[in-house]
């Protein structure tokens, strides 16, 4: 039986620490805590309106994916990993990750509410699984590999790394290119926060596979999972570019195809497997961002000096007028 799944009936508290490396992962993740209201999107509204319609359509597909994907990640954490895993240090990490995923989900909802005032169009994005066949297909694939009745813990961790890494990565890339155009500063800031978090989540899954999983899946199974994820990303990219009529400034879909293969080979390395694609990075000017090497000081520099919120719906507004008696 996997060590991660063995109950220690004699352990009731986190101290003394028994798995220091896992504890260090948790503490690093804890240090990255932020809230969805910390990003100012007021300047994004004009940039969004000035953006060519095909480009807006492309980014709407990305938002539709993210709104759904984070909820599925939360579902897996709460219904599977957090119920099964017994090593407290790992459980602490996943508890913190679940909280972060809730922040991400809220952040994407704020982005949709801020940029897309039409309620019917908002609902089409919030209902991504029903309205976008490729998003439904991706969601089904994620649930398939997260199913404990069908897959070993090792296989599910590989699938989880593929979700947090491969399925998300090209979308992070596409949003980050808006920074090069000097537009959408709020969306870009959210992207930098979230991509940093997801990089940690993905890396931790790879760490567990390499250091804690006894029944590591065969290399051919790992490759199968990763290649399936790449194929889904390819399909999504084609779909999003079709919606944009093939016109998205800064990159082509062929560059995104190559990048996701480059990223997947990096995942193979982290899982101590042979590379699959052996391709170079088509975006060398953004390597530091893509590999989540942003320094912690830069992360905190992203925080605005005051909280602002441009969403007009009171249900999404952040209440800043609490006095001390409310705590």
Curated annotation (Swiss-Prot):
Fe cation 2 binds at residues 101, 164, 198, 201. It holds the Pfam family Ribonuc_red_sm. GO terms for biological process: deoxyribonucleotide biosynthetic process. Keywords: Deoxyribonucleotide synthesis, Early protein, Iron, Metal-binding, Oxidoreductase. The active site is at residue 108. Its EC number is 1.17.4.1. It catalyses: a 2'-deoxyribonucleoside 5'-diphosphate + [thioredoxin]-disulfide + H2O = a ribonucleoside 5'-diphosphate + [thioredoxin]-dithiol. Its cofactor is Fe cation. Induction: Expressed in the early phase of the viral replicative cycle. CDD domains: RNRR2. Fe cation 1 binds at residues 70, 101, 104. Heterotetramer composed of a homodimer of the large subunit (R1) and a homodimer of the small subunit (R2). Larger multisubunit protein complex are also active, composed of (R1)n(R2)n. Ribonucleoside-diphosphate reductase holoenzyme provides the precursors necessary for viral DNA synthesis. Allows virus growth in non-dividing cells. Catalyzes the biosynthesis of deoxyribonucleotides from the corresponding ribonucleotides. Belongs to the ribonucleoside diphosphate reductase small chain family. This is Ribonucleoside-diphosphate reductase small chain.
């Amino acid at each position: 039986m996997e060590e991660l799944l063995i109950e220690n009936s004699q352990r009731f508290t986190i101290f003394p620490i028994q798995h220091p490396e896992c504890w260090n992962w948790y503490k690093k993740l804890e240090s990255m805590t932020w809230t969805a209201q910390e990003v100012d999107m007021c300047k994004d509204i004009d940039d969004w309106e000035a953006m060519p319609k095909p480009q807006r359509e492309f980014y709407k597909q990305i938002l539709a994916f993210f709104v759904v994907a984070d909820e599925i990640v939360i579902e897996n954490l709460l219904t599977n990993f957090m119920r099964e895993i017994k090593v407290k240090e790992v459980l602490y990490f996943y508890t913190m990750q679940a909280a972060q995923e809730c922040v991400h989900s809220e952040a994407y909802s704020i982005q949709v509410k801020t940029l897309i005032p039409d309620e019917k169009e908002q609902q089409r994005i919030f209902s991504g699984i029903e309205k976008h066949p490729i998003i439904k297909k991706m969601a089904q694939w994620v649930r398939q590999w997260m199913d404990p009745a069908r897959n070993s813990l090792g296989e599910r961790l590989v699938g989880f790394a593929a979700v947090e890494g491969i399925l998300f990565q090209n979308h992070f890339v596409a949003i980050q290119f808006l920074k090069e155009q000097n537009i959408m500063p709020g969306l870009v800031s959210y992207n930098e926060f979230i991509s940093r978090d997801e990089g940690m989540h993905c890396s931790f899954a790879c760490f567990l596979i390499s250091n804690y999983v006894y029944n590591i899946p065969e290399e051919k199974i790992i490759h199968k999972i990763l290649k399936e994820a790449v194929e889904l990303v390819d399909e999504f990219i084609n779909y999003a570019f079709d919606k944009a009529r093939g016109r998205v400034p800064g990159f082509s879909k062929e560059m995104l195809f190559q990048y996701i293969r480059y990223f997947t080979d990096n995942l193979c390395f982290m899982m101590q497997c042979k590379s699959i694609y052996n391709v170079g990075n088509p975006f060398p000017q953004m390597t530091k961002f893509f590999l989540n090497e942003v320094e912690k000081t830069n992360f905190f520099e992203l925080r605005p000096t005051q909280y602002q919120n441009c969403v007009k719906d009171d249900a999404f507004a952040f209440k800043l007028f609490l006095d001390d008696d409310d705590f």
